[in-house]
Amino acid sequence: MEKIIVRGGRKLNGTVKVEGAKNAVLPVIAASLLASEEKSVICDVPTLSDVYTINEVLRHLGASVHFENNTVTVDASRTLSTEAPFEYVRKMRASVLVMGPLLARTGHSRVALPGGCAIGSRPIDQHLKGFEAMGAKIKVGNGFIEATVEGRLQGAKIYLDFPSVGATENLIMAAALAEGTTTLENAAKEPEIVDLANYINAMGGKIRGAGTGTIKIEGVKALHGAKHTIIPDRIEAGTFMVAAAITEGNVLVKGAVPEHLTSLIAKMEEMGVQILEEGDGLRIIGPSELKPIDLKTMPHPGFPTDMQSQMMALLMRANGTSMITETVFENRFMHAEEFRRMNGDIKIEGRSVIINGPVQLQGAEVAATDLRAGAALILAGLVADGHTRVTELKHLDRGYVNFHQKLAGLGADIERVNDEEAVHIENKEVVSDLNA
């Protein structure tokens, strides 16, 4: 088992480039199943484990998928299988995004119930409600969700009880080949939704209103392959913004799109962090003293839940009491216990956490409880006394490309090692401490 070892105390300086957005590329690759002719070419694709998983799902379904030099080429013109088995879906809940395109294109989809990060229940009832409104029959049993429709799906007016990103994406894809017009009300507004709509429109789709609460999809009879470049990853950008701030560093985050990061920029500036637009990115200058703040996670354009754990790491360094309220997912404070192992003064009260700072964090062995928590623990390690050892890196690899190498390029004392190497390093450090 591998772990990342961080030795705290270095200010980060330099330039880091953001990858293509993980949360945009997965639905875009899934949407390639809609193309009954021509190949799709998707550029700026990050080399993440989740990308390899969704590629395997498409191959299992009968599509030809080639991934090289950050470019995915998909040919889904042949006859497709309609079942996504548990061996793939258990690794990543985004695999459920093949339901919409399969149902629209073939009239049938059978997908195993999803896996991925263990963040609350994350139900997919909004997806299924939308499919039913468009004329599909749904059966759930034996660990699978099966959807069927006679002929084409029918355009419908669908109100989402919650602006679910996954449901919005799945229903856009299903509606793209439906007969008539579908209207999604209370739709998710994330930049990744806009990216998906732009891709489907390039394939010959007719989608209007993406990025607003009301999206209209006029169904077409067929879609073709298209070339598309994925937007930069706003969560990776935000993570490096926090890395610069927490270490009192000075870092240019290339590819960070200010319009995608409005709430994060506002909250970091409220803490006293200097953020400047520079070229095609943002320069982050961390202050010597951070101010405490309160924040609440919300659907976009509110504060993103995927930045909650990183901000918790930053707030442990703030001078005073801060509060974070999580409204998007339940059970997303598991990293708080790991921060406590590092001397964090954190108290959980229902869906909120109270953070008292500043504290001098202490290096410890901690486990990444989910993807973003893994990054947050590494950020905390950047300013902890001694060395911090972060395990369960499979979560981190689902969302970050060469995270430790990028931090090392900014001056962090960080390395990724296996168990044997870790023991050797720790023994050397014990001897060094004894001789000091």
Curated annotation (Swiss-Prot):
Keyword tags: Cell cycle, Cell division, Cell shape, Cell wall biogenesis/degradation, Cytoplasm, Peptidoglycan synthesis, Pyruvate, Transferase
GO cellular component: cytoplasm
One of the protein's GO biological processes: peptidoglycan biosynthetic process
Record EC number: 2.5.1.7
Catalytic activity: phosphoenolpyruvate + UDP-N-acetyl-alpha-D-glucosamine = UDP-N-acetyl-3-O-(1-carboxyvinyl)-alpha-D-glucosamine + phosphate
Annotated catalytic residues: 117
Pfam families per record: EPSP_synthase
GO MF, one example: UDP-N-acetylglucosamine 1-carboxyvinyltransferase activity
UniProt cross-references to PANTHER family, sorted A to Z: UDP-N-ACETYLGLUCOSAMINE 1-CARBOXYVINYLTRANSFERASE
Family recorded in the similarity comment: Belongs to the EPSP synthase family. MurA subfamily.
Protein name per the record: UDP-N-acetylglucosamine 1-carboxyvinyltransferase 1
Organism: Bacillus licheniformis (strain ATCC 14580 / DSM 13 / JCM 2505 / CCUG 7422 / NBRC 12200 / NCIMB 9375 / NCTC 10341 / NRRL NRS-1264 / Gibson 46)
Lineage of source species: Bacteria, Bacillati, Bacillota, Bacilli, Bacillales
Gene from which the chain derives: murA1
